[in-house]
Every structure is written in C-alpha cells, then in structure tokens.
C-alpha cells in the first residue's frame, strides 16, 4: 500500500516525508479495521480509500490560508486527519456529533501520535469558536448555503470557508447567505478519481 500511495503522490505532484506516508497508510489501516464494526465509510477497499479519502483530502492543503482550522462534520476524520498529517505546523479541530466517530478519531490521534488535532463531539451550532478559526473546512454539507448558515460563527473576521465539492454549480454558488461571496473556485485534479472535484472558497463580502 505504501508503494501505491507513493505512486499516487507522484502523479499528483505532492512531496511528503517517509514518516508522513507511513502515517497516512497507518490511518487507512485503522479506518479499514474500525470500519468493519463501526461503519465509518461506505468505501470498503483500502486501496480505494487511498484515492477517495487520502488524495482527495490532501490535494487541498496548498490552498488553506492560516494555521487554525476546523473540519465540520468530519466523520472518520476527512479531510481533517490527512490534512493534519501533511500540515503538521497547523492545528485541526475535528468536529462531529456522533460518539463512535469521535472515539475512532481519538484512537487515531493516540496511535499516530498526532498532537495537532483535537477531536470534539458536538453539534456545530452548539460549538463555541473561542478563538475563531482561520478556516472552516468541510466535505459533509449538501449545499454551500447550509455550510455558511450553520458555521457562520466559526471563522475569524479574515477567515474563509473551504468546501470540498464535486461539481461547482453556479446556482448553488449564487445562493449564499447575504453578506457572503465566492472568493475562489479551484479545480482539483485527483489521480485515479473519476468525476470533477472542486474547492470552493467563501468569504464575507466586506473584504
């Protein structure tokens, strides 16, 4: 699996240390093991996880501005855990409302010795952002409007929302809550992943 990950990283033009590669493979191993009992992801094949979970997460790392991020609706830690591995200088709060997912995240944190993640069990509307975050990341929300509406209290004044999407649909981007606009739409190229992938960056219009 390490060889396959290395090939995928080469295809994507991403350079990681051997330690980071080993951490990513270990994370896939834990996800595969826990998935059998906890049903954390619909992806059952570890090799497919490398593409659909690992590469699809870390491909956005160069576009994140700041050092404090929150991954809302992180599920089994996606994209937060892979991003924390490839950006050890940044801190990631991993927010999910389901206890079984947060228990898994704490196990990952323990086994991989990740000191730059904080798993939290909470509903997003009940979670206080103190201090606020540089970036709010998610691939869990059905719509951009929902993401901004539910998470508006989380970013700092100069912070951004980062939504990992398949299609970047014009009507969805035009239907943001009042006061917010699209800062950037980045087309992502994930090796061996079929279909379009985009990173939609949202910020307050006052900036």
From Swiss-Prot:
GO terms for molecular function: rRNA (guanine-N7-)-methyltransferase activity. The keyword S-adenosyl-L-methionine applies. Keywords: Cytoplasm, Methyltransferase, rRNA processing, S-adenosyl-L-methionine, Transferase. One of its GO terms (cellular component) is cytosol. It is found in: Cytoplasm. Pfam families: GidB (PF02527). Its main location: cytoplasm. S-adenosyl-L-methionine binds at residues 73, 78, 124-125, 139. Its EC number is 2.1.1.170. The keyword rRNA processing applies. Belongs to the methyltransferase superfamily. RNA methyltransferase RsmG family. Specifically methylates the N7 position of guanine in position 527 of 16S rRNA. This is Ribosomal RNA small subunit methyltransferase G. It comes from Klebsiella pneumoniae (strain 342). The lineage of its organism: Bacteria, Pseudomonadati, Pseudomonadota, Gammaproteobacteria, Enterobacterales. The gene is rsmG.
């Amino acid at each position: 699996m390490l060889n396959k990950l290395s090939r995928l990283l080469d295809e994507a033009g991403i350079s990681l240390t051997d330690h980071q590669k080993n951490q990513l493979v270990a994370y896939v191993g834990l996800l595969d093991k826990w998935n059998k009992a906890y049903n954390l992801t619909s992806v059952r094949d570890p090799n497919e996880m490398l593409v659909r979970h690992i590469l699809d997460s870390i491909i956005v790392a160069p576009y994140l501005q700041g050092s404090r991020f929150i991954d809302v609706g992180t599920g089994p830690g996606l994209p937060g855990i892979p991003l924390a591995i490839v950006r050890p200088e940044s801190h990631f709060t991993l927010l999910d409302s389901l206890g079984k997912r947060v228990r898994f995240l704490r196990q990952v944190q323990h086994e991989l010795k990740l000191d730059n993640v904080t798993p939290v069990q909470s509903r997003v509307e009940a979670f206080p952002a103190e201090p606020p975050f540089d970036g709010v990341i998610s691939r869990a929300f059905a719509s951009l409007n929902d993401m901004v509406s539910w998470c508006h209290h989380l970013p700092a004044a100069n912070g951004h929302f980062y939504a990992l999407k398949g299609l970047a649909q014009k009507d969805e981007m035009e239907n943001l809550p009042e006061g917010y606009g699209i800062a950037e739409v980045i087309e992502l190229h994930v090796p061996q992943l079929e279909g379009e992938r985009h990173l939609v960056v949202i910020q307050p219009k006052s900036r």
